[in-house]
Amino acid sequence: MKEELIERFTRYVKIDTQSNEDSHTVPTTPGQIEFGKLLVEELKEVGLTEVTMDDNGYVMATLPANTDKDVPVIGFLAHLDTATDFTGKNVKPQIHENFDGNAITLNEELNIVLTPEQFPELPSYKGHTIITTDGTTLLGADDKAGLTEIMVAMNYLIHNPQIKHGKIRVAFTPDEEIGRGPAHFDVEAFGASFAYTMDGGPLGGLEYESFNAAGAKLTFNGTNTHPGTAKNKMRNATKLAMEFNGHLPVEEAPEYTEGYEGFYHLLSLNGDVEQSKAYYIIRDFDRKNFEARKNTIENIVKQMQEKYGQNAVVLEMNDQYYNMLEKIEPVREIVDIAYEAMKSLNIEPNIHPIRGGTDGSQLSYMGLPTPNIFTGGENYHGKFEYVSVDVMEKAVQVIIEIARRFEEQA
Protein backbone atom coordinates (compact mmCIF):
# COMPACT_ATOMS: atom_id res chain seq x y z
CA MET A 1 0.00 0.00 0.00
CA LYS A 2 2.80 2.40 0.90
CA GLU A 3 4.47 1.95 -2.47
CA GLU A 4 1.21 2.64 -4.30
CA LEU A 5 0.63 5.78 -2.22
CA ILE A 6 4.10 7.12 -3.03
CA GLU A 7 3.88 6.24 -6.72
CA ARG A 8 0.48 7.80 -7.27
CA PHE A 9 1.06 10.86 -5.11
CA THR A 10 4.44 11.83 -6.56
CA ARG A 11 3.04 11.42 -10.07
CA TYR A 12 -0.12 13.42 -9.37
CA VAL A 13 1.64 16.42 -7.79
CA LYS A 14 3.76 16.92 -10.90
CA ILE A 15 0.63 17.92 -12.82
CA ASP A 16 0.03 21.66 -12.47
CA THR A 17 -3.60 22.02 -11.40
CA GLN A 18 -3.63 25.40 -9.69
CA SER A 19 -7.01 27.09 -9.99
CA ASN A 20 -7.33 30.72 -11.11
CA GLU A 21 -9.53 33.24 -9.30
CA ASP A 22 -9.59 35.54 -12.34
CA SER A 23 -10.75 32.91 -14.82
CA HIS A 24 -14.42 32.52 -15.72
CA THR A 25 -14.12 29.10 -17.34
CA VAL A 26 -15.11 25.88 -15.54
CA PRO A 27 -12.73 24.54 -14.47
CA THR A 28 -10.63 27.68 -14.30
CA THR A 29 -7.43 26.06 -15.60
CA PRO A 30 -6.63 23.45 -18.29
CA GLY A 31 -4.41 21.45 -15.92
CA GLN A 32 -7.48 20.35 -13.99
CA ILE A 33 -9.05 18.98 -17.18
CA GLU A 34 -5.84 17.12 -17.99
CA PHE A 35 -5.70 15.64 -14.49
CA GLY A 36 -9.38 14.71 -14.54
CA LYS A 37 -8.98 12.81 -17.81
CA LEU A 38 -6.05 10.89 -16.35
CA LEU A 39 -8.08 9.96 -13.28
CA VAL A 40 -10.99 8.75 -15.41
CA GLU A 41 -8.66 6.24 -17.06
CA GLU A 42 -7.10 5.20 -13.76
CA LEU A 43 -10.48 4.75 -12.05
CA LYS A 44 -11.46 2.42 -14.88
CA GLU A 45 -8.16 0.55 -14.54
CA VAL A 46 -8.75 0.10 -10.81
CA GLY A 47 -12.13 -1.45 -11.62
CA LEU A 48 -14.69 1.19 -10.72
CA THR A 49 -17.88 1.51 -12.76
CA GLU A 50 -20.02 4.45 -13.94
CA VAL A 51 -16.86 6.51 -14.41
CA THR A 52 -17.73 9.93 -15.81
CA MET A 53 -16.24 13.36 -16.32
CA ASP A 54 -18.70 16.09 -17.21
CA ASP A 55 -18.15 19.26 -19.24
CA ASN A 56 -17.26 21.16 -16.05
CA GLY A 57 -14.46 18.78 -15.08
CA TYR A 58 -16.24 16.87 -12.29
CA VAL A 59 -15.12 13.26 -12.11
CA MET A 60 -17.45 10.64 -10.59
CA ALA A 61 -17.25 6.87 -10.23
CA THR A 62 -18.88 3.95 -8.41
CA LEU A 63 -17.59 1.05 -6.38
CA PRO A 64 -20.57 -1.34 -6.50
CA ALA A 65 -21.83 -2.92 -3.28
CA ASN A 66 -20.68 -6.45 -2.45
CA THR A 67 -23.40 -7.10 0.15
CA ASP A 68 -27.12 -7.88 0.05
CA LYS A 69 -27.78 -5.52 2.96
CA ASP A 70 -29.59 -2.23 2.39
CA VAL A 71 -26.64 0.07 3.08
CA PRO A 72 -26.82 3.86 2.62
CA VAL A 73 -24.78 5.04 -0.36
CA ILE A 74 -21.74 6.92 0.92
CA GLY A 75 -19.28 9.08 -0.97
CA PHE A 76 -15.65 10.12 -0.70
CA LEU A 77 -14.47 13.36 -2.30
CA ALA A 78 -11.23 15.22 -2.97
CA HIS A 79 -10.40 18.22 -5.13
CA LEU A 80 -8.33 18.38 -8.29
CA ASP A 81 -6.92 21.87 -7.90
CA THR A 82 -4.10 23.22 -5.75
CA ALA A 83 -3.84 26.58 -4.02
CA THR A 84 -3.14 29.89 -5.72
CA ASP A 85 -0.97 31.23 -2.87
CA PHE A 86 2.33 29.87 -4.23
CA THR A 87 3.43 28.38 -7.52
CA GLY A 88 2.43 24.79 -8.28
CA LYS A 89 4.31 24.52 -11.56
CA ASN A 90 7.20 22.07 -11.94
CA VAL A 91 6.70 20.44 -8.53
CA LYS A 92 9.65 18.21 -7.68
CA PRO A 93 8.63 16.01 -4.73
CA GLN A 94 11.45 14.85 -2.45
CA ILE A 95 11.06 11.53 -0.61
CA HIS A 96 12.66 11.20 2.83
CA GLU A 97 12.48 7.64 4.14
CA ASN A 98 12.87 6.91 7.85
CA PHE A 99 12.91 10.64 8.62
CA ASP A 100 15.24 11.45 11.53
CA GLY A 101 13.12 14.29 12.92
CA ASN A 102 15.73 16.98 12.28
CA ALA A 103 15.90 19.90 9.87
CA ILE A 104 15.64 19.11 6.15
CA THR A 105 17.48 21.17 3.56
CA LEU A 106 14.92 21.50 0.80
CA ASN A 107 17.13 23.57 -1.47
CA GLU A 108 20.82 23.98 -0.75
CA GLU A 109 21.37 26.55 -3.50
CA LEU A 110 18.61 28.83 -2.19
CA ASN A 111 19.26 27.95 1.47
CA ILE A 112 15.66 26.86 2.07
CA VAL A 113 15.45 24.68 5.18
CA LEU A 114 12.47 23.02 6.86
CA THR A 115 13.28 23.34 10.57
CA PRO A 116 11.72 22.12 13.84
CA GLU A 117 12.26 25.62 15.21
CA GLN A 118 9.86 27.08 12.68
CA PHE A 119 7.60 24.02 12.49
CA PRO A 120 7.55 22.37 15.95
CA GLU A 121 5.41 19.42 14.82
CA LEU A 122 8.22 18.19 12.53
CA PRO A 123 9.99 15.88 15.06
CA SER A 124 6.72 13.99 15.67
CA TYR A 125 7.19 12.47 12.22
CA LYS A 126 10.47 10.80 13.16
CA GLY A 127 10.63 7.36 11.55
CA HIS A 128 8.00 8.20 8.94
CA THR A 129 8.45 8.43 5.21
CA ILE A 130 7.71 12.06 4.41
CA ILE A 131 7.48 13.84 1.08
CA THR A 132 8.53 17.49 0.80
CA THR A 133 8.99 20.09 -1.91
CA ASP A 134 12.35 21.20 -3.30
CA GLY A 135 11.68 24.63 -1.78
CA THR A 136 10.62 26.33 -5.02
CA THR A 137 6.93 25.32 -5.21
CA LEU A 138 4.08 24.16 -3.05
CA LEU A 139 3.65 20.38 -2.85
CA GLY A 140 -0.04 20.00 -3.61
CA ALA A 141 -0.79 17.56 -0.79
CA ASP A 142 -3.87 19.76 -0.48
CA ASP A 143 -5.59 17.89 -1.91
CA LYS A 144 -3.68 15.34 -3.94
CA ALA A 145 -2.97 13.43 -0.73
CA GLY A 146 -6.70 12.97 -0.19
CA LEU A 147 -7.26 12.13 -3.83
CA THR A 148 -4.48 9.53 -3.73
CA GLU A 149 -5.91 7.99 -0.56
CA ILE A 150 -9.33 7.54 -2.15
CA MET A 151 -7.78 5.88 -5.21
CA VAL A 152 -5.72 3.52 -3.07
CA ALA A 153 -8.66 2.70 -0.77
CA MET A 154 -10.92 1.83 -3.71
CA ASN A 155 -8.18 -0.34 -5.21
CA TYR A 156 -7.77 -2.14 -1.86
CA LEU A 157 -11.51 -2.79 -1.46
CA ILE A 158 -11.73 -4.23 -4.97
CA HIS A 159 -8.86 -6.61 -4.27
CA ASN A 160 -10.19 -7.59 -0.84
CA PRO A 161 -13.82 -8.61 -1.42
CA GLN A 162 -13.97 -10.19 2.04
CA ILE A 163 -14.46 -6.63 3.34
CA LYS A 164 -18.18 -6.07 2.88
CA HIS A 165 -19.45 -2.63 1.92
CA GLY A 166 -22.39 -0.90 0.34
CA LYS A 167 -22.30 1.17 -2.83
CA ILE A 168 -19.57 3.80 -2.66
CA ARG A 169 -19.44 6.88 -4.83
CA VAL A 170 -16.24 8.79 -5.54
CA ALA A 171 -15.95 12.37 -6.80
CA PHE A 172 -13.05 14.64 -7.68
CA THR A 173 -13.99 18.31 -7.98
CA PRO A 174 -12.31 21.35 -9.57
CA ASP A 175 -11.69 24.85 -8.18
CA GLU A 176 -12.12 24.12 -4.46
CA GLU A 177 -9.28 26.44 -3.52
CA ILE A 178 -11.12 29.48 -4.90
CA GLY A 179 -14.43 28.52 -3.28
CA ARG A 180 -16.13 27.27 -6.45
CA GLY A 181 -15.74 23.53 -5.92
CA PRO A 182 -19.40 22.51 -5.63
CA ALA A 183 -20.74 25.30 -7.87
CA HIS A 184 -21.61 22.81 -10.63
CA PHE A 185 -21.65 19.62 -8.55
CA ASP A 186 -24.69 17.46 -9.36
CA VAL A 187 -25.75 16.12 -5.96
CA GLU A 188 -28.62 14.16 -7.49
CA ALA A 189 -26.37 12.46 -10.04
CA PHE A 190 -23.84 11.67 -7.31
CA GLY A 191 -26.61 9.83 -5.51
CA ALA A 192 -25.07 9.47 -2.05
CA SER A 193 -26.85 9.94 1.27
CA PHE A 194 -23.70 11.16 3.00
CA ALA A 195 -20.11 11.84 2.02
CA TYR A 196 -16.68 12.63 3.44
CA THR A 197 -14.10 14.98 2.00
CA MET A 198 -10.53 13.74 2.35
CA ASP A 199 -9.13 17.24 2.68
CA GLY A 200 -7.84 17.59 6.24
CA GLY A 201 -4.40 17.84 7.78
CA PRO A 202 -2.54 15.88 10.49
CA LEU A 203 -3.43 12.45 11.86
CA GLY A 204 -6.82 12.16 13.55
CA GLY A 205 -8.40 15.29 12.11
CA LEU A 206 -12.19 15.00 11.99
CA GLU A 207 -13.97 18.21 11.14
CA TYR A 208 -17.60 19.14 10.77
CA GLU A 209 -17.52 22.84 11.64
CA SER A 210 -16.27 25.29 9.06
CA PHE A 211 -16.02 29.02 8.62
CA ASN A 212 -18.77 31.13 7.17
CA ALA A 213 -16.91 32.67 4.25
CA ALA A 214 -17.12 35.63 1.89
CA GLY A 215 -14.81 37.26 -0.63
CA ALA A 216 -14.52 40.99 -1.23
CA LYS A 217 -12.98 42.60 -4.32
CA LEU A 218 -12.25 46.30 -3.94
CA THR A 219 -11.28 48.59 -6.80
CA PHE A 220 -9.75 51.93 -5.81
CA ASN A 221 -9.82 54.60 -8.53
CA GLY A 222 -7.36 57.47 -8.37
CA THR A 223 -6.30 60.42 -10.47
CA ASN A 224 -2.75 60.45 -11.79
CA THR A 225 -0.96 63.69 -12.62
CA HIS A 226 2.68 64.74 -12.78
CA PRO A 227 3.95 64.64 -9.18
CA GLY A 228 5.57 68.04 -9.63
CA THR A 229 2.19 69.70 -10.14
CA ALA A 230 0.01 67.25 -8.24
CA LYS A 231 -1.12 69.42 -5.35
CA ASN A 232 -4.92 69.31 -4.96
CA LYS A 233 -5.16 67.26 -8.16
CA MET A 234 -3.68 63.82 -7.58
CA ARG A 235 -5.60 61.04 -5.84
CA ASN A 236 -3.38 58.02 -5.23
CA ALA A 237 -5.36 54.79 -5.60
CA THR A 238 -2.74 52.73 -3.78
CA LYS A 239 -2.96 55.07 -0.80
CA LEU A 240 -6.75 54.67 -0.86
CA ALA A 241 -6.21 50.92 -0.56
CA MET A 242 -3.83 51.50 2.33
CA GLU A 243 -6.36 53.78 4.00
CA PHE A 244 -9.09 51.17 3.64
CA ASN A 245 -6.90 48.47 5.17
CA GLY A 246 -6.00 50.83 8.01
CA HIS A 247 -9.65 50.95 9.07
CA LEU A 248 -9.71 47.18 9.69
CA PRO A 249 -8.78 45.92 13.19
CA VAL A 250 -5.11 44.88 13.08
CA GLU A 251 -5.55 42.02 15.54
CA GLU A 252 -8.36 40.42 13.50
CA ALA A 253 -6.07 38.98 10.83
CA PRO A 254 -5.03 35.34 10.26
CA GLU A 255 -1.61 35.86 11.85
CA TYR A 256 -3.24 36.88 15.15
CA THR A 257 -6.21 34.50 15.36
CA GLU A 258 -6.87 30.85 16.19
CA GLY A 259 -9.58 28.43 17.30
CA TYR A 260 -13.01 29.97 16.83
CA GLU A 261 -11.74 33.48 16.11
CA GLY A 262 -12.64 35.02 12.77
CA PHE A 263 -10.62 37.40 10.61
CA TYR A 264 -10.22 39.71 7.63
CA HIS A 265 -7.41 38.65 5.30
CA LEU A 266 -5.86 40.81 2.58
CA LEU A 267 -5.05 38.15 0.01
CA SER A 268 -3.67 40.41 -2.71
CA LEU A 269 -3.02 44.08 -3.49
CA ASN A 270 -1.99 45.29 -6.93
CA GLY A 271 -1.97 48.67 -8.56
CA ASP A 272 -0.57 52.12 -9.06
CA VAL A 273 -1.64 55.73 -8.65
CA GLU A 274 -4.45 55.47 -11.20
CA GLN A 275 -6.04 52.25 -9.99
CA SER A 276 -5.45 49.62 -7.32
CA LYS A 277 -7.27 46.36 -6.65
CA ALA A 278 -7.43 44.51 -3.34
CA TYR A 279 -8.93 41.11 -2.63
CA TYR A 280 -10.01 40.16 0.89
CA ILE A 281 -11.49 37.05 2.39
CA ILE A 282 -13.79 37.35 5.41
CA ARG A 283 -14.16 34.43 7.80
CA ASP A 284 -16.09 33.69 11.01
CA PHE A 285 -17.68 30.62 12.62
CA ASP A 286 -20.58 32.56 14.12
CA ARG A 287 -23.16 33.69 11.54
CA LYS A 288 -23.98 36.95 13.36
CA ASN A 289 -20.29 37.86 13.64
CA PHE A 290 -19.87 36.94 9.97
CA GLU A 291 -22.64 39.33 8.93
CA ALA A 292 -21.14 42.01 11.20
CA ARG A 293 -17.76 41.63 9.47
CA LYS A 294 -19.36 42.13 6.06
CA ASN A 295 -21.17 45.19 7.41
CA THR A 296 -17.83 46.57 8.60
CA ILE A 297 -16.42 46.26 5.07
CA GLU A 298 -19.48 47.97 3.60
CA ASN A 299 -19.41 50.78 6.15
CA ILE A 300 -15.74 51.57 5.51
CA VAL A 301 -16.48 51.70 1.78
CA LYS A 302 -19.40 54.09 2.37
CA GLN A 303 -17.26 56.36 4.54
CA MET A 304 -14.55 56.52 1.88
CA GLN A 305 -17.11 57.14 -0.88
CA GLU A 306 -18.53 60.05 1.11
CA LYS A 307 -15.02 61.42 1.54
CA TYR A 308 -13.59 60.88 -1.96
CA GLY A 309 -16.58 60.30 -4.24
CA GLN A 310 -18.77 57.35 -5.21
CA ASN A 311 -16.34 56.00 -7.81
CA ALA A 312 -13.28 56.19 -5.56
CA VAL A 313 -14.02 52.78 -4.05
CA VAL A 314 -16.04 50.04 -5.77
CA LEU A 315 -16.95 46.92 -3.77
CA GLU A 316 -17.97 43.47 -5.01
CA MET A 317 -18.65 41.07 -2.13
CA ASN A 318 -20.06 37.56 -2.31
CA ASP A 319 -20.73 34.79 0.18
CA GLN A 320 -18.69 31.67 -0.59
CA TYR A 321 -19.87 29.04 1.90
CA TYR A 322 -21.39 28.64 5.36
CA ASN A 323 -20.61 26.71 8.55
CA MET A 324 -21.54 23.09 7.82
CA LEU A 325 -22.32 22.31 11.49
CA GLU A 326 -25.96 23.26 11.02
CA LYS A 327 -26.40 20.54 8.38
CA ILE A 328 -24.22 17.88 10.02
CA GLU A 329 -25.86 17.88 13.47
CA PRO A 330 -29.15 16.27 12.28
CA VAL A 331 -27.16 13.31 10.87
CA ARG A 332 -24.57 13.14 13.62
CA GLU A 333 -24.19 9.36 13.09
CA ILE A 334 -21.90 10.01 10.10
CA VAL A 335 -19.47 11.77 12.42
CA ASP A 336 -19.84 9.00 15.01
CA ILE A 337 -19.01 6.30 12.46
CA ALA A 338 -15.85 8.14 11.38
CA TYR A 339 -14.93 8.68 15.04
CA GLU A 340 -15.41 4.98 15.87
CA ALA A 341 -13.48 3.96 12.74
CA MET A 342 -10.48 5.99 13.90
CA LYS A 343 -10.65 4.66 17.46
CA SER A 344 -10.73 1.07 16.19
CA LEU A 345 -7.49 1.80 14.29
CA ASN A 346 -5.83 3.27 17.42
CA ILE A 347 -6.08 6.76 15.97
CA GLU A 348 -7.07 9.45 18.47
CA PRO A 349 -9.71 11.62 16.77
CA ASN A 350 -8.91 15.31 16.88
CA ILE A 351 -12.20 17.14 16.51
CA HIS A 352 -11.74 20.82 15.83
CA PRO A 353 -13.26 23.52 13.63
CA ILE A 354 -11.90 23.85 10.11
CA ARG A 355 -10.11 27.17 9.89
CA GLY A 356 -10.74 27.09 6.19
CA GLY A 357 -13.27 25.55 3.88
CA THR A 358 -13.79 22.29 2.09
CA ASP A 359 -16.20 21.32 -0.63
CA GLY A 360 -18.18 19.78 2.22
CA SER A 361 -19.03 23.22 3.56
CA GLN A 362 -21.12 23.96 0.49
CA LEU A 363 -22.22 20.41 -0.26
CA SER A 364 -23.77 20.11 3.19
CA TYR A 365 -26.05 23.03 2.27
CA MET A 366 -26.82 21.39 -1.08
CA GLY A 367 -28.28 18.30 0.60
CA LEU A 368 -25.15 16.18 0.94
CA PRO A 369 -23.87 16.29 4.56
CA THR A 370 -20.09 16.02 4.26
CA PRO A 371 -17.63 16.07 7.20
CA ASN A 372 -13.88 16.28 6.58
CA ILE A 373 -11.16 13.73 7.39
CA PHE A 374 -7.38 14.06 7.77
CA THR A 375 -4.95 13.29 4.93
CA GLY A 376 -1.53 13.63 6.58
CA GLY A 377 -0.41 16.97 5.15
CA GLU A 378 1.22 19.89 6.94
CA ASN A 379 1.99 23.53 6.07
CA TYR A 380 -0.35 23.70 3.10
CA HIS A 381 -0.13 26.33 0.37
CA GLY A 382 3.60 27.03 0.56
CA LYS A 383 7.14 25.80 -0.02
CA PHE A 384 7.33 24.14 3.41
CA GLU A 385 4.37 21.87 2.69
CA TYR A 386 4.95 18.18 3.33
CA VAL A 387 3.01 14.97 3.85
CA SER A 388 3.60 11.81 5.88
CA VAL A 389 3.09 8.66 3.82
CA ASP A 390 2.56 6.75 7.07
CA VAL A 391 -0.37 9.01 7.93
CA MET A 392 -1.68 8.73 4.38
CA GLU A 393 -1.75 4.97 4.93
CA LYS A 394 -3.80 5.52 8.11
CA ALA A 395 -6.23 7.69 6.13
CA VAL A 396 -6.71 4.87 3.61
CA GLN A 397 -7.47 2.52 6.50
CA VAL A 398 -10.06 4.97 7.84
CA ILE A 399 -11.84 5.10 4.47
CA ILE A 400 -11.95 1.30 4.38
CA GLU A 401 -13.16 1.05 7.98
CA ILE A 402 -15.91 3.66 7.45
CA ALA A 403 -17.18 1.67 4.47
CA ARG A 404 -17.06 -1.55 6.50
CA ARG A 405 -18.90 -0.02 9.47
CA PHE A 406 -21.72 1.38 7.35
CA GLU A 407 -22.30 -2.14 6.01
CA GLU A 408 -21.98 -3.76 9.44
CA GLN A 409 -24.47 -1.35 11.03
CA ALA A 410 -27.02 -1.53 8.21
Curated annotation (Swiss-Prot):
EC number(s) reported in the record:
3.4.11.4
Query: Could you tell me what this protein is called?
Result: Peptidase T
The record's annotation in InterPro entries points to:
ArgE/DapE_CS, Bact_exopeptidase_dim_dom, Peptidase_M20, Peptidase_M20_dimer, Peptidase_M20B
Which reaction(s) does its UniProt entry say it catalyses? Release of the N-terminal residue from a tripeptide
**Stated family:** Belongs to the peptidase M20B family.
Tagged with keyword Secreted: no
Localization: Cytoplasm
Q: What does this protein do?
A: Cleaves the N-terminal amino acid of tripeptides.
Q: How is the cofactor bound?
A: Binds 2 Zn(2+) ions per subunit.
Pfam family name, one: Peptidase_M20
In its UniProt entry, the species of origin is given as Bacillus cereus (strain AH820)
Top EC group: hydrolase
Q: What's the cofactor?
A: Zn(2+)
Q: What GO terms are given for molecular function?
A: metallopeptidase activity; tripeptide aminopeptidase activity; zinc ion binding
Annotated residues for binding of Zn(2+) 1: H79, D142, D199
What's the source species' lineage? Answer: Bacteria, Bacillati, Bacillota, Bacilli, Bacillales
An example of a Gene Ontology cellular component annotation for this protein is: cytosol
Which keywords does the record carry?
Aminopeptidase, Cytoplasm, Hydrolase, Metal-binding, Metalloprotease, Protease, Zinc
Where do the annotations place Zn(2+) 2 binding?
D142, E177, H381
Q: Which processes are annotated in GO (biological process)?
A: peptide catabolic process; proteolysis
Q: What is its main location?
A: cytoplasm
Catalytic residues as annotated in Swiss-Prot or TrEMBL: D81, E176 (proton acceptor)
